[in-house]
Amino acid sequence: MAEYIYQMIKARKAHGDKVILDDVTMAFLPGAKIGMVGPNGAGKSSILKIMAGIDQPSNGEARLTPGYSVGILLQEPPLNEDKTVLGNVEEGVAEIKSKLDRYNEISAAMADPDADFDALMAEMGTLQDALDAANAWDLDSQLEQAMDALRCPPPDAEVKHLSGGERRRVALCKLLLEAPDLLLLDEPTNHLDAESVLWLEQHLASYQGAVIAVTHDRYFLDHVAEWIAEVDRGHLYPYEGNYS
């Protein structure tokens, strides 16, 4: 039997008198593409934060299955104010970039006649397997293409000077390159032009992980979602198919 990537079991969450989740039980599989809809103030953003582990239910359970990763695009995403646009985007690929840098270091070290060639070759082989699996040999090109597609500001721009929309595009670019197993998107098409939205739709259509997107953009949902989860007065109602 397939393993769920995420589960809520009798989850309840309230902010004062406002009920966000009322005894909700739900689960979905890896690779699911879900659009979350509902009226403003229904608690959709709060549900995403619970799924991301930023918040917790008051009662019941909400858990990501161990071994899976999760990432979220918040409406006001945090960025590293001490880094440039490129520096923030590179955080999304920090682990694989360090492997690529180490591979290049070993390649240079092999020119030393006194090097321990057996040890270096063994390490290089391990790194090559990881880089092959991540399709990381053209990493710089992948970053450049994603930043261009999402209309990110210039790579050397300081994020502390960016507008809210520019910050969201940088955060979205970083998150997509990070490629978590569960991708949570809060209004992902806000501040994107039509070409960027089209690129995002195509990217998510082939995305290997699960995607949950909160959005009012019904055209986006028609192109991305395979299920719709409607949030209404603390309850969550799933429907198979896209928005239309």
Q: Where are the model-predicted features located?
A:
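ABC ATP-binding cassette signature C-motif
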Residues: 1-244
